[in-house]
Amino acid sequence: MKRTKKDIYKAYGIEFKGNKLYCDPLNMWINPLLTIGTNTKIGNAATWSIYHGNEMLNISDFGPKTAAIMAAANITEIKGSCPCHCDGCYCDSGRYCFDNVKAGNMLKLILARLYTDWTRRAISAQIEADDIMQIRIHAAGDFFSHEYVGMWYDIVSKFGKVIFWTYTKYEYALDKFETCLNFFITPSITPAGFNFGTCAELLYKYNKLTKLGYKVHICACGTTMQNHCADCKHGCKAVGIECDFVLFIKHSSRTYKAGKNDPIEFAAVCDIIAQQNN
């Protein structure tokens, strides 16, 4: 008999009712920790965000929702998650400025910093219960400690067919996840999505995904060094190509042109495209 979500969460020692989790550390009911969206092309995709920046965050600086979360944890201040605070950080503007978003990210920062084991169990239970197949870690925030990296290492290792990806400035994380085939980690240099990248980034992703047994198709439209095909995110599958992932060469920009900046990697990508079209 198929297990219910309640059964799965119970196996991880967490009470689940009405799509809410009972958070023992804070004595409150909360939403599942991963936000499920549609930003990828296979299965259920999810994101994990924690409060960004590297300054000390004080309860007096926040609105009522965020302040209530901090009060529930019996803290008046907590350090942000990033190794540094970048000029022009996108988390300083837009939707990240709404108090409900700040409250959600603060909640997860508190849980990750102070209650790491509970957070690991809650995330693991949700991956299993919601059949999540791809996770972007840190839509906001970054790795902040060896223990926190270890939490994600345990999760990534447990779910070997789930794809995890992120950007980071935390060097320990780059080394820790080196042997995890299902974890794609890039130094924080470009704000690209998982399916887009330079030729070198595409080769890295292509090799790891194929080793995991996924069928990967690289779209040829980027090899012309012109504009991508119309709606190329979905175009390849629309013409009947069956695959798990479609990868695309990064659009040409002022600083990057496929084939000019990276002729060796570009040639290797073109070879793969030629072979897949035979």
Language-model regions, residue ranges each:
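Class I S-adenosyl-L-methionine
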Residues: M1-N278
